[in-house]
Curated annotation (Swiss-Prot):
A single GO molecular function term of this UniProt record: calmodulin binding
Record's GO cellular component terms: chromatin; cytoplasm; cytosol; euchromatin; Golgi apparatus; membrane; nucleoplasm; nucleus
Quaternary organization: Binds DNA as a homodimer. Can form a heterodimer with ESR2. Interacts with FOXC2, MAP1S, SLC30A9, UBE1C and NCOA3 coactivator. Interacts with PELP1, the interaction is enhanced by 17-beta-estradiol, the interaction increases ESR1 transcriptional activity. Interacts with EP300; the interaction is estrogen-dependent and enhanced by CITED1. Interacts with CITED1; the interaction is estrogen-dependent. Interacts with NCOA5 and NCOA6 coactivators. Interacts with NCOA7; the interaction is a ligand-inducible. Interacts with PHB2, and UBE1C. Interacts with AKAP13. Interacts with CUEDC2.
Name of the protein in question: Estrogen receptor
Lineage, opening ranks: Eukaryota, Metazoa, Chordata, Craniata, Vertebrata
Amino acid sequence: MTMTLHTKASGMALLHQIQGNELEPLNRPQLKIPLERPLGEVYLDSSKPAVYNYPEGAAYEFNAAAAANAQVYGQTGLPYGPGSEAAAFGSNGLGGFPPLNSVSPSPLMLLHPPPQLSPFLQPHGQQVPYYLENEPSGYTVREAGPPAFYRPNSDNRRQGGRERLASTNDKGSMAMESAKETRYCAVCNDYASGYHYGVWSCEGCKAFFKRSIQGHNDYMCPATNQCTIDKNRRKSCQACRLRKCYEVGMMKGGIRKDRRGGRMLKHKRQRDDGEGRGEVGSAGDMRAANLWPSPLMIKRSKKNSLALSLTADQMVSALLDAEPPILYSEYDPTRPFSEASMMGLLTNLADRELVHMINWAKRVPGFVDLTLHDQVHLLECAWLEILMIGLVWRSMEHPGKLLFAPNLLLDRNQGKCVEGMVEIFDMLLATSSRFRMMNLQGEEFVCLKSIILLNSGVYTFLSSTLKSLEEKDHIHRVLDKITDTLIHLMAKAGLTLQQQHQRLAQLLLILSHIRHMSNKGMEHLYSMKCKNVVPLYDLLLEMLDAHRLHAPTSRGGASVEETDQSHLATAGSTSSHSLQKYYITGEAEGFPATV
């Protein structure tokens, strides 16, 4: 009995000693495992061994299979407040630790299974918002990572930041390298699928241009032929899209020689055609049709016009063949110049040129598709501009002089004999110098002259009927065709896209200067008529009166409509009938057939 009591006392003392030794580590600060990775990476994979250090300094190596059988403490979450050690380790035994002489084959883990995470560490169950990250290659959208965790180790935090920065830089450099290899469509700026018809273009623009060059190109812009063509609005206006295709350099023969053939490309072409057919009835075309009134979307009875089916080379050939012959003046070198003699020479030459101008206009592609009234109207508005651009073109090879005819070459001093003629001479010489500096070609000259004819009176039609609107639409389409021919000539000459745009703008700006010269010349000629300096010939006189009729300004306080009505009652009808007479007599005299 005594032995038994002694044994119990010794056992209790030994037990208290063991408790003191084992509970000593509990007085140290609580160990927290830093989480350097998202929670999804904290749980161990069965193939990766791990090593954990415990307060006693012992190291245990185990894998996830052993960890699955390990005893887990603190099922309600890790305590983060002072005085919570007892709650963390429970009340069974000595803080939940097994005896020292019976080490468990499974190591201890201070980890939580996924269902038991604390609320503030619970990962989001939905998509994390996106944020912008500033990289050297620009602002890019990236998916936000998991929420930030408490990291007591500042070195580990800096190391993690350096790793993320290095990863971001690598991604940014890869994005920049891939961006350098990306090519965009020259028409709509979408991603290019290849080199089609001479330029880098997408599949949609390639299919659209393919359909257009096969004859389906009778498009009409519902606005001002200046629609924006980009990825989102390329289907809204087919006319402006086709124009931009030509502007960027697309051409029928612009196919790469290293292009492969075979079944793969045949299947690809079929897919392109299917996509192209889907574009015809797109919502963008329906919106464009509904936005504009029906008079602008009239049925095109002239859509089968021969002029609209000509290629660029055929258009140039037709315009060159239509050029009038060179006429000689009645100049007598033995007679000195006077105001009356010089004006007589010039007006006689202009009157004879007008007869040939009528024949030339009838051979301009698309001109004879208009009504006779509209043909006369365009000629009445543009005749002096056409004469002046021809004079400037002939004078290119004679700096400082104007070649009115092969036997009539005048300089500025000779023009002083006519009052008010020097100012007009100076403007003509300046325009000729500009043509010479630009090295204007004959093909470009005939295109510019045709543009003057068709564009001069298109906005001054006296009627606004449906027929008149149809005529205007036809004129605009022929003008677009001639403009495309100009661009084709520049591309054929080897000019870059930027040089083509610059040259086209410079040429069209010269036309406004020629219009200004024509107005000055018309005023001077009318003043000569009022002074009775020289008798004017019938056709020239009627052309002058017709131009005064179509002038937009009113005289003597009368309105424009009243002025037009008074002229129509007097000279207007006579002028039109007289000019129509020259049409009939010109055909009877055997002029060449029209286009």
